[in-house]
UniProtKB/Swiss-Prot annotation:
BP GO terms, sorted: proton motive force-driven plasma membrane ATP synthesis
Species of origin: Histophilus somni (strain 2336) (Haemophilus somnus)
Function in brief: Produces ATP from ADP in the presence of a proton gradient across the membrane. The gamma chain is believed to be important in regulating ATPase activity and the flow of protons through the CF(0) complex.
Protein name: ATP synthase gamma chain
Keywords assigned: ATP synthesis, Cell inner membrane, Cell membrane, CF(1), Hydrogen ion transport, Ion transport, Membrane, Transport
Family: Belongs to the ATPase gamma chain family.
Protein's membrane topology: Peripheral membrane protein
UniProt subcellular location: Cell inner membrane
HAMAP family listed in its UniProt record: ATP_synth_gamma_bact
Gene Ontology cellular-component terms listed: plasma membrane; proton-transporting ATP synthase complex
Assembly and binders: F-type ATPases have 2 components, CF(1) - the catalytic core - and CF(0) - the membrane proton channel. CF(1) has five subunits: alpha(3), beta(3), gamma(1), delta(1), epsilon(1). CF(0) has three main subunits: a, b and c.
Gene: atpG
CDD domains, alphabetized: F1-ATPase_gamma (cd12151)
């Protein structure tokens, strides 16, 4: 059994670690709430653009934007959004499993796959696999700036318009709640058809006049909409990261508390044994006299 002094040192070390994990838990909780607010505030913008795009595309059936046209899929682009930092449980591992499963499915169909990577963890992982990477970006911090994300998104969209990619998907961790984050893959382009239920029951009740003309507006809005979808995915992934980190740090804090309790019992036993030995020595010395 270790001596009482060694056990006291271990207890002190675990207590220091517990203070750090508790602080990280509280910081993650604060950041998660801020990210949730940012996530909620960006949704109405995306919803409004969805409605306008649906209205214009249905009213001008003679004009088909490339982002709305389905074509034979020979090349797929996947935008994978991961975290820049660790200590967030199995968040990235589950995301990578989802992405690799889809990549495997595409390759089995003889479809070429190109990746766009956002987040240092994803960049490091997929570079090690030797997959084709078309664009990458990291160092977003806790408040991602839309302008910084537009570059990597536009590279994927330009490749689609040039015919180098036939479909683009985005993979990220969808924020369900504090305890649940789900890795998902969603189609970006060609844009899935929007039904009236997803746009609101009054989406077709008004006739609008668009200037300079519907086609020019549609060209601009589609790009803005897709950029907003990428930004929304990044923000949701960030909220998932903070939630996962908060849960992981809480578990670490609780485990540290349990370890301290166990060490305290061991320390008490060691101290009791030491006192017993000292008493035995005193009694033995007195008996010898």
């Amino acid at each position: 059994m270790a001596g009482a002094k060694e056990i006291r040192t271990k207890i002190s070390s675990v207590q220091s670690t517990q203070k750090i994990t508790k602080a990280m838990e509280m910081v993650a909780a604060s950041k998660m709430r801020k990210t949730q607010d940012r996530m909620s505030s960006s949704r109405p913008y995306s919803k409004a653009i969805q409605g306008v795009i649906s209205h214009i595309s249905k009213a001008n059936i003679d004009y088909q934007h490339p982002f709305l046209i389905e074509r034979e899929v020979k090349n797929v682009g996947i935008l994978i959004i991961s975290t820049d930092r660790g200590l967030c449980g199995g968040l990235n591992v589950n995301l990578f499993k989802t992405a690799l499963s889809e990549i495997k499915n595409w390759k089995e169909q003889n479809v070429d796959v190109s990746l766009g990577l956002i987040g240092a963890k994803g960049i490091g992982f997929f570079q090690s696999l030797g997959l084709k990477i078309k664009a990458q970006h990291s160092g977003m911090g806790d408040t991602p700036v839309a302008e910084e994300l537009i570059g990597i998104a536009n590279r994927m969209f330009e490749a689609y318009k040039e015919g180098k990619i036939d479909a683009i998907y985005v993979t990220y961790n969808k924020f369900i709640n504090t305890m649940s984050q789900k890795p998902i893959m969603e189609k970006l382009v060609p844009l899935p058809e929007l039904d009236n239920d997803s746009l609101g029951k009054n989406s077709d009740n008004w006739e609008y006049i668009y200037e300079p003309n519907p086609q020019t507006l549609l060209d601009s809005l589609l790009v803005r909409y897709l950029e907003s979808q990428v930004y929304q995915a990044v923000v949701e992934n960030l909220a998932s990261e903070q939630a996962a980190r908060m849960v992981a740090m809480k578990a670490a804090t609780d485990n540290a508390g349990n370890l301290i309790n166990d060490l305290q019992l061991v320390y008490n036993k060691a101290r009791q044994a030491s006192i017993t030995n000292e008493l035995n020595e005193i009694v033995a010395g007195a008996a010898a006299i």
